[in-house]
Amino acid sequence: MLRLCIDLNIWVAALLAERLAVCASNRKGRSNTASQYLVELVRSGASPVGEVSLIISLGMLDELRSVIIEHLDLNLDIADAYISAIEEYAKLGVQLTLGGTGVIALRDTEDLHVLETAIAGKADFLVTANFKDFLVRRDTQVKIVNRHAIYHSSAHSLQIVHPYLMVEWLRSGKIPTIA
């Protein structure tokens, strides 16, 4: 089973692409973006390399709800429907966590919470478009600049991956493992 922690920027990008795609008057609508592809894999619980389980926390869901309402200017009903759908995806793999360890040195508390959630949930991959924000100097080994790194801790090791690279790996059926 592939255990994915999807950063909030991926959920937001997928929602925006979907909303643009359904606006008949907007010709800039996008479909089949990397973010949409990843969200669809989580929704279906399956990928070209096997089953998919979502790792997410209640704190991440609360933050996503706030971003949808305050920054995307969408109404509460849309935000709640989106959050409820994500909660259901997480229940498929029973990986809704309460939080993390509190000992990782990241500048941004939201990014810290996401990384801690990925570790607490034993994610194989943390997928984020904000790659550089998750690099912890002494604990992270960069494999491909701005695209792929391995985070090591005593509790768990995981791969931090840009969505484009993650989608490329999934479509090829070749997912690297931590050596």
Regions of interest found by a model, annotated:
Residues 132-179:
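Acidic, PIN/NYN-like endoribonuclease modules and their adjacent C-terminal/linker elements
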Residues 8, 58, 129-131:
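Short secondary-structure boundary segments
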Residues 18-28, 104-105, 136-144:
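Short, flexible/disordered intra-domain loops and linkers
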Residues 88-126, 131-139:
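Active-site neighborhoods of divalent-metal-dependent phosphate/nucleic-acid chemistry enzymes
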Residues 42-101:
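PIN-domain endoribonuclease scaffold, especially VapC-family toxins
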Residues 12-14, 63-65, 134-137:
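Short catalytic/ligand-binding loop motif for oxyanion handling, primarily in non-cytosolic enzymes
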Residues 1-56:
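Short, well-structured N-terminal submotif of metal-dependent ribonuclease cores
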Residues 62-63, 99-106, 165-171:
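A short acidic, often aromatic-flanked loop/helix-cap motif at beta-alpha or helix-coil junctions
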